[in-house]
Amino acid sequence: MASLVDSNIVVYRCDPRDPDKQRAADELLRAGIVSGTLVLAHQSVVEFFAAVTRPRRDLGGAPLLSADEARIQAELLLAEFRVVYPNRDVVQTALRGTATYGLSWFDAHLWAYAEVYGFEEILSEDFTHGRHYGTVRVVNPFAADGVHELPPLYA
């Protein structure tokens, strides 16, 4: 079973401000590379670059990564993971997701990738852990019960 990975998981891999989440994200992503079970949406790569290059007040105005470092990391993501791209169905499904589930545009867009491409899970800390949106279950890999402890939708 393949899972779609939200940008927040990828950002934590490069964010030393929360060592526990950084370690968990790194372990999860490394395991996903080996197993081939994690997929990134084009949106997650774009959001990753924007998030890690944005100035951070708590870092004295410095970003998590320089633009050059972020570009290298984004290119590695493109090389290491399967990346899915938007099409008409993804956009239409996202538009419906904002109305049906009350999701923000970016969350609805990420969910739409999973729904349209047939992924059973989204790994994210931005949605409600364990909730199903259509055929897609959201799992927060940082939650106490973790990725593999939730029962499948149709067991």
Set out the residue ranges of the language-model regions.
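Acidic, PIN/NYN-like endoribonuclease modules and their adjacent C-terminal/linker elements
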Residues: W111-A155
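Short, well-structured N-terminal submotif of metal-dependent ribonuclease cores
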Residues: M1-L40, P55-E69, D145-L150, A155
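Active-site neighborhoods of divalent-metal-dependent phosphate/nucleic-acid chemistry enzymes
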Residues: A79-L123
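Acidic active-site catalytic centers that drive phospho-/nucleotidyl reactions
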Residues: D6-N8, E47, D107, D126
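Short beta-strand segments at enzyme active-site cores
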Residues: V39-Q43, L123-S124
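Helix-adjacent hinge/juxtasegments
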Residues: V52-N87
